[in-house]
């Protein structure tokens, strides 16, 4: 602890020490001016803002007990997070010394006890009495050592972290109370709180209504129509809205969405803990009557000296426990006052305080304890003090030789929180913790002589403006009206704290890139199933099923004959069981001819897992079968390259557009990208599937083959054409045969009874009567096509039939040739007699394509053809006619008048057209020469055409405030209209209130001398004749 130096040589005094003395003299001179009062000081602008926080603190004094006399206990609640402001507008927090609980936790059962001297106990008269009194010898007193129990010491670092964490949590809850009339009210776009919240989120109402100076600067921004998003920038630096701390602007509140200012109601209250008493005191303390102390104020006249006598009572409810194993020596302390002549040359060493957080050394008193069995008696030392220039200089406490010889000295740390004048007994209980010092100057004299480690305690200075220099207690301006010019010089311990600047680094979210396989020409599924083997071909009997149709028969067209041979890809299995045919089932049935429905023959897919399942031996050759086509695997060239089928959209050979402008394919591409037409007659939805199996035994047609088995077949439905060329396996060979469309075969068939085949799959057949019909089949299934080339087909009817329809096993399309057949149970042989007509198959796909070309024309191919239109100089194509409902071109010169500038605005209007799947705009009609809409598409004949509008000259006036205004980003016209000549006419209101505001005298000067309200218009108009009206208004 730095020692007090008396009469130090001024030449050795540091510059900082001199500056400190000059500041002390200046403040002393200001305080001695009786004309300057605290009310005058509070008239300063910066103090007016904190007037209520400094002077109107809630103070309560508890009544003293009978044994305590004039001792008082203060219980105060600091209502502001700032203890006080200095003359430099800097807010100062006073932090309690170590051992004092920072937060008053209600859950803590142990209450801290504080016994201190009231700052009002030493009045001005007492100080004067002390100044004029002489040194009074201190009386000896005895102490009994007892055990002391101290609370845990809190470090400054822990305290600062706890305070910051409390502040961050405290400002999250109070925003929900904004607008609640129980907590405040609105005034001039500012929320006024009726109280405050402490750090524990407890609400306290103000006991005295505070005269809060409301900030008014932000109200000017609210009255503006268009508010700038950076309106708050001019408010930075305004003390009504915040303060600067460490060169950072800190707001005292926030603005809501309506720009209302809402201040922060959180205040860190530091309550003085209540005194705890014990029902059974451990030690009884008896003290003699205290001596009389006289103090004379040297700054006052001699007549102002007053003698005051005070007595110190015995505190029975307090208990002091000391270590009984240690005996303290008796101590005699004297501190003589300085002479008046030594005032000017007085030099007191003050330790240098760095600009950081400092700690305050609490009072430590060294006393002597004597053993006693029942009680401990304390006797207070009397100190003679001379108050000079607000600074004190004490002699080092002296100890008598007699007291030192009695017992070894022992220092006891009482752990007081303030530097107090020892003018009364301070008794500390077992849970001795002190409360926070108040935000006033301390008026007591301290005698400190202790070699024990100092306890933690510091002043924490918050700089709200620009200065960062720390303050000591001696630099604080007068805070209470009863205070004069005294201040306390105490030892201090420097503690330096550094606040680390947080470094924010951007958080990078790792991204994982995954490759996605691009699928081009994706197929839904592959419907091609084949089973090839090197084993000999298996002969099978055809199974024909008749289906009744309600539609009119349509003639068939010749079909393509395609042969392809694929690799052994087996995805589905068919079990074929060889069974003998029962001859009694094959009876000839002769019935009356009936109307024969078209026979629908469908292709099937025959797949076998193994070659053994597909091999069937013939047990009977007596039954004749329908001519079968030999299917033989042959090597072909390698697979062709992938086909860009999207380029074929629009080609009439591959499909057509329907009424909805959707492209419809008339076939599909096989494994080798060969086009296969599947245009067949569309049947009823309930038409049953027909299984057709054929077996080629030799290269020639066999008419005598015994149906010895009926294989179990599985029919696959035909999906939508979806060409995924990657999923189709490459065939081993392919051979195609072009159909001959010039033949229309007519086959005579006899009714046939279905043979009874014993197998897992039983196919029922219907008898077909002899009839002639035509049908137009539709594709129903997609299966693998495997046919023989035309060059290898030989028929015994070659002389009579020039060509025959070619049927393949596992065909990918349905073969439905127009037939007139005679079927018998015994034989399916085609009769080659003169009665049998020639087989003339038609190419059905070619006919369908022709129909598609008639139904849908690719008019885009006609653009540029001078027979259909011409190009404008601007490069626009203008049609010279239109296509009617039957897609027939109708030349019409009247459509040439339409230009792009006339119908561009109509593109996108569903009344005049639509977009197809390609994104092209399709018109429903056209405008004729008269400008009227002519509807062409009958499907949209119910749509009403748009009425042609006048030139939109008024669009240029949108945005002109003379004609309207914007409301919610929507332009609204004033109450008016344009006449036929384009003049703007405003409608005036006919309300009586508006009529009263009209000054008729301005429009009609004749009425200037008349009372307009009393004039009868009819009576006034009667004085004019018709000729007068014509002269004024004209003949009309």
From Swiss-Prot:
Keyword Cell inner membrane assigned to the entry: answer is no
Q: Can you list the GO cellular component terms from the UniProt entry?
A: attachment organelle; cell projection
Database matches in Pfam families: EAGR_box
Q: Where are the sequence repeats?
A: 718-723, 738-743, 776-781
User: What InterPro entries is this protein classified in?
Assistant: EAGR_box (IPR022466), EAGR_sf (IPR038145)
Region ranges (Disordered): 697-727, 757-784, 798-845
Which spans does this entry mark as compositional bias, Acidic residues?
A: 707-727, 773-784
**Highest taxon, organism lineage:** Bacteria
Q: Where in the cell is the protein located?
A: Cell projection, Attachment organelle
Free-text disruption phenotype from the record: Has impaired gliding motility, glides at a slower speed and with longer resting periods than wild-type. Binds equally well to erythrocytes and a human lung adenocarcinoma cell line, but colonizes mucin-producing cells less well than wild-type cells.
Instruction: Reply yes or no: does the keyword Disulfide bond apply.
Output: no
Principal subcellular localization: other
Q: Give the stretches traversing the membrane.
A: none
Q: Where is this region: 3 X 6 AA repeats of E-P-E-P-N-F?
A: 718-781
Q: Which UniProt keywords apply?
A: Cell projection, Repeat
According to its UniProt entry, the function of this protein is described as:
Protein cytoskeleton-associated which plays a role in gliding motility and perhaps also in mucociliary clearance.
Q: What is this protein called?
A: Protein P200
